[in-house]
A protein has these predicted regions:
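Pyridoxal 5′-phosphate
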Residues: 2-423
C-alpha cells in the first residue's frame, strides 16, 4: 500500500468511517441488492465471505474465540504499520482521538455514556477490577452463580481468603423451563450481609441464560451491587446496559464481538465509579490520589497500550452496525435454534435449554467427560469443525456460519453417536 492510500485509510479510521476489504462488496451495497430481504441466505453467504477462514476448518466456538472480519484485521495491520513507520509522539497523537471514537462507538452500541466505558484487555481483567476494587469489609458477603467463569468465581474466593469476606454460590436448575426458576434461588440466598451479586449473562458451560434485569431489580431493592460477566452476549445480543440495569458489565472483544484480540470492555454505572478502586495506576492516572482521567477511564490506566487494536474497536462496531445489531442477534438465535432442533430430532440430549428466553448462542451436547477430547478432535480432523469440550461438546455458531455449516455439524455428530455415549 502506498503512503497516500495508507493516509487515506487512517483518515477514514480516525473519522469513524469503516471500510470493506478490496474486492469484497460492501455490506450496505449487499443489503441494497437484496432489497428488503437481508434475512435471505444469500446475504449471510456474503457475510461469511467477509471472514478469511477456510471451509475445511470452520470455527463454531464463538464462546471462546472468533475470527475477525477482514475489515477489522486489515485495520489493525494498517494502524500498527503506521506506528512502526513513525512512532513519534507527533504521529501517535491521533490515536487519542481514535481511542475516544472507539469508546463512543461502544457506548452508543450499549446505550450508555462514554464516561462509563473503560477499554481494558479482556473479560478476566474487567472481572478482577470489580473484584479487587469494590470496598468490601470483613464479613461482607458476595453471592455468585455457581456457573460463573473462574475470574468471576474463584477470584472472589481468593479475595475472601485475603480480606475475610465470604462467598456463597447459588445453584440453578439444570433443566429450567421458566424464568422464575432462575430468579427464586437467588432471592432465597440473599441475606443482610450480601453486598455483591456476581452473575453471568449466558453460561459458557451450560448455555443457560440468566434473567439479568429481574435479578438486578431484586438486588437493587437491597442496595446490592450487581456485576455481570457478559462475555457471551457482547456482539451476540443487541444489548442496552441501561435497560439491563446492572452496575457493572465485563466482556471481551475477541469473542462474539469479532474484534481485535486483547481488548476488553468494562462498563461501570456512573453512580458507582467513584467507589471502585483501580487495579493498576500508571502515568495516565495523574500525580495524586484523585485521577486526572474522567469517569471509567481510570480503570484503563495501564501505561503503553496497543493503540492499533484499540482504534480498530470502532471499525468492529461499524461492522456490526452495517449488519444491524438486531439482525446479528436474530441470526445467531436462528443458527443456534436450527442446531438445537436438529440435534434434538436426532435424539441427542442437550445441556442447553431450547427456549431462547433461557439461552443464547451457546449450544452444548451431553458427552461423558472421558470422551469429550476424542469427540472434539474427531469433529475437527474429520469434519472440519472447531468446537469445545466445555460442559460437553460445545458448538457456538455466529454470523460467519451458514446453514450448510449447521447441517455439517449435525451430520458429524450423528456419525459420532456411539463415540459420544448417546447410542
Amino acid at each position: 500500500m502506498t503512503d497516500l492510500s495508507r493516509r487515506s485509510v487512517l483518515h477514514r479510521l480516525a473519522q469513524g468511517t469503516a471500510f470493506i476489504s478490496a474486492g469484497l462488496p460492501s455490506l450496505s451495497a449487499l443489503t441494497s441488492s437484496l432489497g428488503a430481504a437481508p434475512d435471505h441466505e444469500a446475504f449471510w453467504e456474503m457475510v461469511r465471505r467477509q471472514f478469511p477462514f477456510r471451509e475445511a476448518r470452520v470455527p463454531m466456538n464463538a464462546a471462546n474465540l472468533c475470527p475477525a472480519p477482514r475489515v477489522v484485521a486489515e485495520a489493525v495491520v494498517e494502524l500498527t504499520q503506521d506506528i512502526d513507520v513513525d512512532c513519534s509522539f507527533n504521529n501517535r497523537r491521533k490515536f487519542t482521538t481514535m481511542l475516544e471514537l472507539s469508546r463512543k462507538q461502544v457506548a452508543d452500541q450499549l446505550g450508555v455514556d462514554s464516561d462509563e466505558v473503560a477499554l481494558v484487555r479482556n473479560t478476566s481483567e474487567a472481572n478482577n477490577i470489580i473484584n479487587n476494587g469494590l470496598p468490601l469489609q470483613e464479613g461482607d458477603e458476595v453471592l455468585l452463580w455457581g456457573q460463573n467463569h473462574p475470574t468471576n468465581n474463584v477470584a472472589w474466593q481468593v479475595r475472601a481468603a485475603r480480606f475475610h469476606s465470604s462467598v456463597k454460590r447459588v445453584k440453578t436448575p439444570t433443566e429450567p423451563t421458566r424464568i422464575d426458576q432462575l430468579v427464586e434461588p437467588f432471592e432465597a440466598a440473599l441475606g443482610p450481609r450480601t453486598k455483591v451479586l456476581a452473575l453471568t449473562h449466558v453460561s459458557n458451560v451450560s448455555g443457560e441464560r440468566l434473567p439479568i434485569r429481574e435479578l438486578c431489580e431484586l438486588a437493587h431493592r437491597r442496595n446490592i451491587h450487581v456485576h455481570v460477566d457478559g462475555a457471551q452476549t457482547w456482539g451476540a445480543f443487541n444489548l442496552n446496559l441501561r435497560e439491563l440495569q446492572c452496575d457493572s458489565f465485563a466482556a471481551s472483544s475477541h469473542k462474539w464481538f469479532c474484534g481485535p484480540k486483547e481488548v476488553g470492555l468494562l462498563y461501570v454505572k456512573r453512580s458507582r465509579i467513584a467507589e471502585i478502586w483501580p487495579n493498576l495506576v500508571s502515568p495516565g492516572w495523574g500525580s495524586d490520589v484523585n485521577p486526572d482521567v474522567k469517569g471509567a477511564r481510570k480503570f484503563e490506566s495501564f501505561g503503553q497500550r496497543d493503540d492499533a487494536r484499540l482504534a480498530a474497536i470502532a471499525t468492529t462496531v461499524d461492522f456490526h452496525r452495517r449488519l444491524g445489531f438486531d439482525r446479528v442477534e436474530a441470526r445467531i438465535f436462528e443458527l443456534a435454534g436450527a442446531l438445537k432442533s436438529g440435534l434434538k430430532a436426532e435424539g441427542f440430549r442437550l445441556v442447553t435449554p431450547e427456549d431462547p428466553k433461557l439461552s443464547g448462542g451457546v449450544c452444548i451436547i451431553q458427552v461423558p467427560p472421558e470422551k469429550r477430547g476424542e469427540v472434539l478432535n474427531r469433529l475437527y480432523t474429520r469434519y472440519g469443525i472447531a468446537g469445545s469440550t466445555a460442559g460437553g461438546l460445545r458448538l457456538c455458531p455466529h454470523v460467519y456460519n451458514t446453514m450448510a455449516h449447521i447441517d455439517r455439524a449435525i451430520g458429524a455428530v450423528r456419525e459420532m453417536r456411539s463415540m459420544m455415549g448417546q447410542a
